Amino acid sequence: MYPICTVVVDGLPSESSSSSYPGPVSVSEMSLLHALGPVQTWLGQELEKCGIDAMIYTRYVLSLLLHDSYDYDLQEQENDIFLGWEKGAYKKWGKSKKKCSDLTLEEMKKQAAVQCLRSASDESSGIETLVEELCSRLKDLQSKQEEKIHKKLEGSPSPEAELSPPAKDQVEMYYEAFPPLSEKPVCLQEIMTVWNKSKVCSYSSSSSSSTAPPASTDTSSPKDCNSESEVTKERSSEVPTTVHEKTQSKSKNEKENKFSNGTIEEKPALYKKQIRHKPEGKIRPRSWSSGSSEAGSSSSGNQGELKASMKYVKVRHKAREIRNKKGRNGQSRLSLKHGEKAERNIHTGSSSSSSSGSVKQLCKRGKRPLKEIGRKDPGSTEGKDLYMENRKDTEYKEEPLWYTEPIAEYFVPLSRKSKLETTYRNRQDTSDLTSEAVEELSESVHGLCISNNNLHKTYLAAGTFIDGHFVEMPAVINEDIDLTGTSLCSLPEDNKYLDDIHLSELTHFYEVDIDQSMLDPGASETMQGESRILNMIRQKSKENTDFEAECCIVLDGMELQGERAIWTDSTSSVGAEGLFLQDLGNLAQFWECCSSSSGDADGESFGGDSPVRLSPILDSTVLNSHLLAGNQELFSDINEGSGINSCFSVFEVQCSNSVLPFSFETLNLGNENTDSSANMLGKTQSRLLIWTKNSAFEENEHCSNLSTRTCSPWSHSEETRSDNETLNIQFEESTQFNAEDINYVVPRVSSNYVDEELLDFLQDETCQQNSRTLGEIPTLVFKKTSKLESVCGIQLEQKTENKNFETTQVCNESPHGDGYSSGVIKDIWTKMADTNSVATVEIERTDAELFSADVNNYCCCLDAEAELETLQEPDKAVRRSEYHLWEGQKESLEKRAFASSELSNVDGGDYTTPSKPWDVAQDKENTFILGGVYGELKTFNSDGEWAVVPPSHTKGSLLQCAASDVVTIAGTDVFMTPGNSFAPGHRQLWKPFVSFEQNDQPKSGENGLNKGFSFIFHEDLLGACGNFQVEDPGLEYSFSSFDLSNPFSQVLHVECSFEPEGIASFSPSFKPKSILCSDSDSEVFHPRICGVDRTQYRAIRISPRTHFRPISASELSPGGGSESEFESEKDEANIPIPSQVDIFEDPQADLKPLEEDAEKEGHYYGKSELESGKFLPRLKKSGMEKSAQTSLDSQEESTGILSVGKQNQCLECSMNESLEIDLESSEANCKIMAQCEEEINNFCGCKAGCQFPAYEDNPVSSGQLEEFPVLNTDIQGMNRSQEKQTWWEKALYSPLFPASECEECYTNAKGESGLEEYPDAKETPSNEERLLDFNRVSSVYEARCTGERDSGAKSDGFRGKMCSSASSTSEETGSEGGGEWVGPSEEELFSRTHL
């Protein structure tokens, strides 16, 4: 690592190494070995002639002759012992041995070689001669080599100086890495290990790395070693002198001395021990502040070392000695650390590894002591100067030391707080890092990252892994400022860095930078009326620079303040160190995972969008509340942001803040949620961070992701950054970061944690968080008027009312909201549930604002409705009203979308079923299950607000299915409502292209709404809510299809591609995610799929072992995602289903493998597997793909939303299916979903009804529910184990709708439209026909559900959609669901379906 210290093995070891160096072969020995080639070849040939295995014995004999030594004393003692024991048999042997002892070592070796070869050869003749010849040859070789070496040594008084630097470096590096085991006075250079050298030769570099990298540039490490002994002495005398003075003068003197010292061997040999023991111990912790910094200083040269630390040299020598004495024990390092720290504090004020406090504890190896010192040092100007210099010089230079130094110091288990984290946290001194460094950072990131010096320094001091190498951030502060600052401030550089650097590298940075980046776009462009996330989404390509600049400003200005406040408070409340540690650990773990603390911390700083700091997001509501108590918006955003933080853990982000109890760590895609749980407060931050991290790579996404209004990274970051980075986009369509991010987010939502644990945690945590939220949200919410407002990023005109009930309900309904982490959302839900009409009215009122109070109300109300009024008629009424709003008021399309979404959520309680919102061409509402949560994507206006709301019955079930998150996409914000906590769940996960601020459709279209933002929700239904379903087998699980116990529970990949009408121009760039894209490609269908805009939503319910393969809309069917709309239009004509059938002649056949597989293996499919997002390969690929395609086709059949419908289907349809078609339920559900989606938009119920009337009729009727014991069981017993069907049914049916609800729905559907539709699918009236008619049934059910909803919602499109969702669940469930949702509509819908 320290080239300077490199011992020239060739020169230096010459004799001393060969003779005295017990460890590595001396240079002479090495050269001899090189010269052995010819001899070895000759010997091999000779041995082969004797019939001896040359391969084995050549090397053995040579080794024996060249290296073996003989201990005469021991041999004689042994002989005596043997003689004493047996004078008989061993007498001769002993005598012979004695004779041997009389022999010379050479003779003994020869004898041993002869005996060895004779034992291996049949022929005894010729071997002695051979050995003699061999020995003579070897002697010649050795004499020649010795002559060469002597000449070499004589020729140059200082062979080391003579030796080429590369040779020195190589040898020195080698010995540094592999120090000799013995303490013999070998040449110091030789002895120098990476540890030693870093102490002796590069310990200056270590100090320089932390203190003055330039000083560390003293690269004559081997010489340094020789002169270092002197220098050490000199330094010890000079220690008092300033580090720079000493280092510079001594580095020069020492260099000269070292180079000039021809007595390198002498001094090093003597001094090596000293150094190894003395300096090594103390100085051992070279600049572990950053391995790269130290390496840089070392590589930069020992000059810098000498300059920077004359003291350091002494210290290092001492440290080395101590190390050597202690065998480089962590203890000795630690012991040295303190002294070293003190010295370092002097020397490295700006030591990158200024995590002195934590370093001591964390770094027991003494690697970090330097960091610790660096942290302590920040106070010392000199140290700072050195540090700055060193940082500049050794920014990314890594001293060779890191090779052998335990990298664990740098690399920490992803799940743990890495030592780095701890160091960084401890490095709060880094806040003192150096005013220079801080200033530098502050220029780019100071506002955000450095708002709390702690935080920034944490990042800087922490260092980062770049290209797999750990670079100490402090050393890289300049670049880090770009990197960290950029990432924090969304600097254009940061974007580059983020892309170039892996998340793991910038984890600590990402906490802040991504958030800031996300905020920046919002702050600048989003501030212009669009949420950052939306802005970012829209301008992903152009955002990088703009976002950075504007975002920086916003962050630095307003957001910085928020961040600082948050960071400061966050640090104080959570403890900056703890947060950072957690953050870093989480980040280190995986960007994919939502880092619990780090993300939150960053999120916190970016809690709000440009108006609201994301910082609030940092620490869930609690932290945010404290930090942002005065900043309601921030807090709301924080809550939202928390959820957004989780956003990348699919939808947990939404819940993160409010659902912090949800333990996004658990729910957050479960990847980093574990950390999150450790860091409850940090969790939310983590979510944001993760999402930030995940989306950090896309600077634009960052900013946008942290939607200003949304204040949750989800808005934009989830779309691309978080998901892309974290989950490595599973969908081919990563072009749309919305979809990408969501895609990433979705997978592993709950896979990480056990659902029950998550649920319990969510519930407990929800209560805690609710209380926190209640305490905090009221302040923030009232301030901001509403959490929804902050979530939606739109001030709700009705926010006053909403805000009040929101706030009130935060307290009151928080428990009621089933663990609404965020009381606001829950209260909104409650409000919706209680006053569905009110919510609808609000939505109507806010037609102009679309995203004002209405959107917020809707978001919350939607969830509340779905949750509180699971299958209540009031919900239906609200839904109907909202639906009408959708259909009636395109201008209030967003509002309507919200209403529809609400309607859809409540209505199509099954998360799999797309809600009616999709029905209306203006506003496409997609209901889908994301992260185990039933979600609806709704487009409002061209804004295409998406609201994903849990089904009304989710109230209990979602809560129970804590793992399942409900993603509410309201307006441009995506809110994640965890199954358990809806209130927090309504945080925006991400903002759609359109931001609430830009309510107008032009906004969606023009604003760069994201060209179509598609978000993929990859949810592990089982992981999220399997346990809950098991716990409450049936009705209460919003995600009936995701029964944790149901191995069949599918991970739902929902890709929502949203292209606002205004974004039509962007549509080319927008590619619907494979599964989610419903209508991205064909705008013709976009009315269906994308409400006003082209919203493509495709949800594929995938059985746990289902192979999920992103399927493009075109691949699935001509209509692709748009088919849902298209088909809904066709549905009335019954074309889409046939079309679907045409595409896949037997869509169910395709699904059957999945369903059967899931049913058969579902039980065996471990919940943990599902939770972990792993799908068993057991599912046949063709079957899986077919099922996926079929489900997609079915989706397209019913609507592009089929996938959504499918997933909802999983809940509702699947329930019915399970009742109707246990094995086929998966397929049928998928298909039904498709049909439902078709119906959803245009009453695909027509088509569905026609195809599935009979089938639907059978399953739909409550009697049929009873008819199908499986379904009944699912509804009632919810016994997954009852049958394969049963678990399916239970998963799909009972959780979605209580038996009574399902029955009611069925009754409604049947009574209203069930009979009418029966005729259509009557051919499959019985269970036998379930499989065949399942698709039809699903369609019919969709239609029926749509009809019910239609009646309820007064808008056929919406109702159709809703009903579709319901019917997609299954005919029975669909009917029932539809009935539940909208009794009268169902009839109408079915009539239309029949049409």
From Swiss-Prot:
InterPro entries with a match to the protein in the record: DUF4603
Name the source's superkingdom: Eukaryota
Phosphoserine PTM positions read: S814, S1080, S1194, S1338
Name the Pfam families for this protein.
Answer: DUF4603
Q: Indicate which residues the UniProt annotation says bind ATP.
A: A89, Y90, K91, K92, W93, G94, K95, S96
Comp. bias regions, Low complexity: 155-166, 205-222, 287-301, 349-358
Where are the compositionally biased (Basic and acidic residues) regions?
230-269, 337-346, 369-391, 1346-1359
Please provide, alphabetically and separated by semicolons, the GO molecular function terms listed in this UniProt record.
Answer: ATP binding
Region described as Disordered: 146-166, 205-391, 1110-1132, 1346-1395
Keywords, comma-separated and alphabetical:
ATP-binding, Nucleotide-binding, Phosphoprotein
Q: Where is the composition biased (Basic residues)?
A: 313-328
The protein here is known as Uncharacterized protein KIAA0232
Organism per entry: Homo sapiens (Human)
